[in-house]
């Protein structure tokens, strides 16, 4: 089994793909996995750290604010898109995947779009209740849309494509022993308050 996972931008897109990739390796000893992401995304740190090969594309997100800087950014994004599509095509033909799985983020668009065009089975997972821009753009092309919530099914033009799976998480979250974790952190019986943050806004978090 040969699988391409395509994702990028934020950990919320990357970590679910890593979780599924690890599970595939555990259950299929002959499984070969390749990741595709953006040149400057968090995936460049997170994916190799988990031991997976990563192919990168020169691609960026679209700016919603149509300021002069935003317009220029979008023009540059469109310029790079053609090259990203061609590289995605080359990588897909060389790797010969059995399936391409995207977990959202702008970096997943070229591989999903090109994979569908080349006749490779494709699927996209959307963790958010309301689909993001990339998911909306590839929804008509992919073979399967996986979502975290039953209510999200109505967000798509073809509900028959939609499968409710929940959001993938790493296996260690499911089997961690509470007492052992507290001991490892040296907490003893002290009360513990956890403040959980995510995505790119974590840099602004403060108490």
Q: What residue ranges belong to the model's regions?
A:
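Conserved nucleotide-sugar phosphate-binding/catalytic loop shared by glycosyltransferases and other
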Residues: 3-10, 30-83, 165-167, 197
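Conserved donor-binding/catalytic core segment of Leloir-type glycosyltransferases
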Residues: 4, 187-202
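Short amphipathic alpha-helix
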Residues: 13-25
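Glycine-rich phosphate-binding loop signature in dinucleotide/nucleotide-binding domains
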Residues: 28-29, 90-98, 185-188
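Active-site-proximal region of nucleotide-activated glycan assembly enzymes
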Residues: 42, 53, 116-179
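A short helix/loop element that forms part of the nucleotide-sugar donor recognition site in Leloir-type
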Residues: 72-73, 174-187
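Glycosyltransferases and closely related glycan-assembly transferases
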Residues: 87-100, 107-123, 136-141
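Conserved small/polar residues in nucleotide/adenosyl-binding loops
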Residues: 205-207
């Amino acid at each position: 089994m040969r699988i391409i996972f395509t994702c990028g931008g934020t950990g919320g897109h990357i970590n679910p793909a890593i979780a599924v990739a690890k599970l595939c390796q555990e259950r299929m000893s002959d499984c070969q996995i390749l990741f595709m992401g953006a040149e400057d995304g968090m995936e460049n740190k997170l994916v190799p750290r988990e031991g997976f090969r990563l192919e990168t594309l020169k691609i960026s997100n679209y700016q919603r604010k149509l300021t002069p800087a935003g317009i220029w950014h979008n023009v540059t994004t469109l310029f790079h898109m053609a090259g990203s599509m061609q590289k995605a095509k080359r990588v897909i033909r060389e790797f010969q995947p059995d399936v391409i799985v995207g977990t959202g983020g702008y970096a997943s668009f070229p591989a999903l779009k090109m994979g569908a065009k080349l006749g490779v089975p494709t699927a996209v997972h959307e963790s958010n209740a309301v689909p993001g821009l990339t998911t909306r753009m590839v929804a008509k092309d992919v073979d399967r849309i996986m979502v975290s919530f039953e209510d999200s099914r109505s967000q798509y033009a073809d509900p028959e494509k939609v499968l409710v799976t929940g959001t993938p998480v790493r296996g260690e979250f499911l089997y961690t022993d509470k007492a052992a974790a507290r001991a490892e952190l040296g907490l003893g019986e002290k009360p513990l308050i956890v403040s959980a943050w995510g995505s790119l806004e974590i840099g602004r978090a403060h108490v």
